[in-house]
Amino acid sequence: MSDNSEVQGIHPVELSVYSLVSSDLDNLYQAINELRESQALLILKLRTVRDSLRLENELLFDSNEYKAQFKEVNNLQKRLQKITLRLKDLERRSSQLTTSS
């Protein structure tokens, strides 16, 4: 007994399995598509947040704004070191004068 599906090359068992599994496959395909859509939305949201954080970081931590202040602090530190050395030298001389008198 030859079936119409056998003539087309599809075995009846194969057709039965497909009919049983096809609804699950359709649901799985739909779920995968929904996941892809939500993934795309999440990527867009993450990019928006990343760009916002980059902009905020640039505004808060603009290194050009602080370069002059850092340079001034470094200059003050160097001056302080020189003054400290001079003070030590003067203290040493003073102690020599007091001990020799």
UniProtKB/Swiss-Prot annotation:
Which chain positions lie within coiled-coil regions?
62-100
The main location class comes to other
Sorted UniProt keywords: Coiled coil, Endosome, Transport
Keyword Transport among record annotations: yes
Q: Which GO terms describe its biological process?
A: endosome organization; regulation of protein localization
Annotated Gene Ontology cellular component terms: BLOC-1 complex; endosome
Subcellular localization is given as: Endosome
Q: How does it assemble?
A: Component of the biogenesis of lysosome-related organelles complex-1 (BLOC-1).
Q: Which family does it belong to?
A: Belongs to the SNAPIN family.
Q: What does this protein do?
A: Component of the biogenesis of lysosome-related organelles complex-1 (BLOC-1), a complex involved in endosomal cargo sorting.
Which protein is depicted?
Biogenesis of lysosome-related organelles complex 1 subunit SNN1
Q: What is the lineage of its organism?
A: Eukaryota, Fungi, Dikarya, Ascomycota, Saccharomycotina
Gene that specifies this protein: SNN1
